[in-house]
Regions:
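Acidic-basic catalytic patches of nuclease active cores, encompassing PD-(D/E)XK
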Residues: 1-12
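Short, charged, amphipathic alpha-helix that recurs within catalytic cores of restriction-modification
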Residues: 49-70, 74-77
Length: 99
């Protein structure tokens, strides 16, 4: 889905700083840290609801670790791809480092 929308995989899924499901790069150079969540259905709030504050902190930590390796860090954002059964929802800019 993301590759069809001109996103390119910028990196593998993990580093010493922690795990990020996908690190993609938009055509404009923005790095997109993507968390993919799956649930068989949307009971109990669905897949997107499982990205709580602790998970966001771990993703921000991993992204910070990744960005430190770059001479000039590009703009970045955090997206969530939530899969509930057959329904896929892409939440662009689902949260930011200030959350």
């Amino acid at each position: 889905m993301l590759v069809r929308r001109n996103y390119r995989v910028a990196r593998g899924p993990s580093s010493r700083g922690g795990e990020v499901d996908l690190v993609m790069r938009e055509r404009d150079g923005t790095l997109v840290f993507v968390e993919v969540r799956w649930r068989s259905d949307d009971r109990f709030g669905g897949a997107a609801a499982t990205v709580g504050s602790a998970k966001r902190r771990r993703l921000i930590f991993a992204a910070t670790h990744y960005l430190r390796r770059l001479a000039v860090p590009p703009p970045c954002r955090f997206d969530v791809v939530a899969v509930d059964g057959d329904h896929i929802e892409w939440l662009r800019a689902a949260f930011d480092a200030g959350d």
